[in-house]
Each structure stands twice: as C-alpha cells, then as structure tokens.
C-alpha cells in the first residue's frame, strides 16, 4: 500500500523531472528551480514534505515550525555562525541548498506531526517568512482563527507592508 510519504516522494520526483526537463530543453530556463511544501492529514497525523525554504507550521497553543529550510542561512544557524533571529535579514537569506528542478533527482525531507481538532496548519513561501517574524505570524493567525481566509489576507498584507518584493504564498487550514 502507498504511504503518505511515498506518495509525496513520487509526486515530487515527477514534478522535479518536469521542471528539470523544461530547463534542459529551453536555454532561457537553464538553472531554474523552485521550492515546495506539501501536507496531507490522515486521522491525527499530518504528513509533510518540503524542499527549499517554503515552510510548514503548526499552531496548537503556539506556532511551531516543523520543516527545516534547505538554505545557507539555516546551515549557518545549525553550525552556530548566526542566531535564528538573524536569518530573515541576513544578506545570504535567499541562497537555497536544495531545490526542485535543479538536478535530475531530488529528495524531500518528510515529517510527521500529531495534530488535533482546532490546530491551524500553515504552508507558506519565503515571501511571507522573510518579511514577517514568526511571533507576528502567530499573533495574526490567533486573532483571526475563526476566519482562515481573512487570516491569510492579513498575513499577505503584513508581508507587503514590510516591503515584500517576492511572491507570497500562504495556505491556512484549521482542523
């Protein structure tokens, strides 16, 4: 039987092949790649996969980042060179170390996390997290917990007001 993790791995590998082939066939697209984050909830478990610096968060009582960025600044945090708080403003914040479509194969990181009714799941691109601190994301989501559409709009608005120049992707789901 196909597991959620194997389903993610197969879907991401298929997407990777498409992007990689496009980049190989069209000189103007050479070197292109993208990030991906996906989630699937089954019973009381969320299965998550990511590549790059798009993130998955769970809001239970507090906002918790589940995924780990595939980025130079994340490696700098892990090695103790910089503090986590410095990631958003670091000059190398946009250098990712793993992407979809840049190599002929790619492997996502996969996570499993327990979820409960009332939890809020957030999947987002770095267009949000480079502009809005986690504490502010948590505040906005908590204040708008009854209206996920409004919460999403407010997160995008906050990123834009902070000077957002990147694409901002936000998916919110309340269980």
Question: Positions of the model-derived regions?
Answer:
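PP2C/PPM-type serine/threonine phosphatase catalytic domain
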Residues: 1-175
């Amino acid at each position: 039987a196909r597991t959620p993790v194997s389903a993610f791995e197969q879907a991401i590998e298929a997407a990777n092949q498409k992007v990689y082939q496009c980049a190989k066939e069209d000189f103007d697209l050479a070197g292109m790649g993208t990030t991906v984050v996906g989630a699937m909830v089954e019973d009381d478990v969320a299965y998550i996969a990511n590549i790059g610096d798009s993130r998955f968060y769970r809001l239970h009582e507090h906002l918790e980042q589940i995924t780990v960025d595939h980025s130079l600044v994340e490696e700098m945090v892990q090695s103790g060179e910089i503090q986590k708080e410095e990631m958003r403003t670091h000059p190398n914040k946009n250098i990712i170390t793993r992407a979809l479509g840049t190599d002929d194969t790619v492997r996502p990181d996969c996570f499993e996390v327990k979820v409960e009714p009332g939890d809020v799941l957030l999947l987002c691109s770095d267009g949000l997290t480079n502009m809005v601190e986690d504490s502010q994301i948590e505040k906005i989501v908590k204040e708008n917990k009854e209206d996920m559409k409004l919460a999403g709009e407010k997160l995008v608005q906050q990123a834009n007001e902070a000077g957002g120049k990147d694409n901002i992707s936000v998916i919110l789901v309340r269980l």
